[in-house]
């Protein structure tokens, strides 16, 4: 089992039209706090980011936000967090969130969320970490991505073991249970000539 003290959550800073996404963010934030796990996220106070952080804070949870200085005003940096760390770039934000987190959950979001998810999954594929990476699939939001991952694996462009680096869950409870039950993977880092 993986010792989980902090979970990094990727999600949108926009306000979605579907209230189920907001509800899922609130439920996840609340559950992370109830399980006495630190929430690490992008530091915004709007959209799903704000819902997530506010729910964790309302439950008395520890919340660390990581936000680039240039986005502080645009994403309306959350000033009520346990800790808000300003960084100089998006890359530094992702690296610090990675360093602070023992696992990752992706809620619905836009291109930034997709990019953060892809980067931590790629780092796992390269053998740089074995931290769990989980999709919280709210009402089928991530179905097209799951289908694309399956298509890439079926086409031989993604090894089956690497396809399974991103796990799909359908509730906050399931996401955190999958993370808690995860075992560090002892994977090969590279494809051999025989496997080509």
Specify the residue positions occupied by each region the protein language model found.
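Active-site/ligand-binding-proximal alpha/beta "capping" segment
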Residues: 92-127, 134, 185-191
């Amino acid at each position: 089992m993986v010792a989980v003290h902090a979970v990094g959550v990727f999600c949108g800073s926009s306000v979605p039209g579907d209230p189920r996404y907001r509800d899922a963010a609130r439920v996840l934030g609340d559950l992370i706090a109830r399980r006495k796990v630190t929430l690490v996220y992008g530091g915004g106070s709007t959209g799903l980011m704000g819902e997530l952080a506010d729910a964790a804070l309302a439950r008395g949870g520890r919340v660390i936000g990581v936000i680039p200085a240039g986005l502080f005003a645009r994403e309306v940096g959350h000033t009520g967090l346990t800790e808000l760390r300003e960084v100089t770039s998006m890359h530094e934000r992702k690296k610090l969130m990675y360093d602070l987190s023992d696992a990752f959950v992706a809620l619905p979001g836009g291109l930034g969320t997709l990019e953060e998810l892809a980067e931590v999954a790629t780092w796992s594929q390269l053998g740089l970490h074995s931290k769990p990476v989980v999709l919280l699939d709210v009402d089928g939001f991530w179905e097209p991505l799951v289908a694309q991952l399956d298509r890439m694996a079926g086409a031989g462009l993604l090894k089956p073991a690497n396809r399974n680096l991103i796990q799909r869950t359908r509730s906050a409870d399931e996401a955190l249970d999958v993370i808690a039950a995860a075992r560090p993977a002892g994977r090969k880092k590279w494809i051999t000539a025989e496997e080509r």
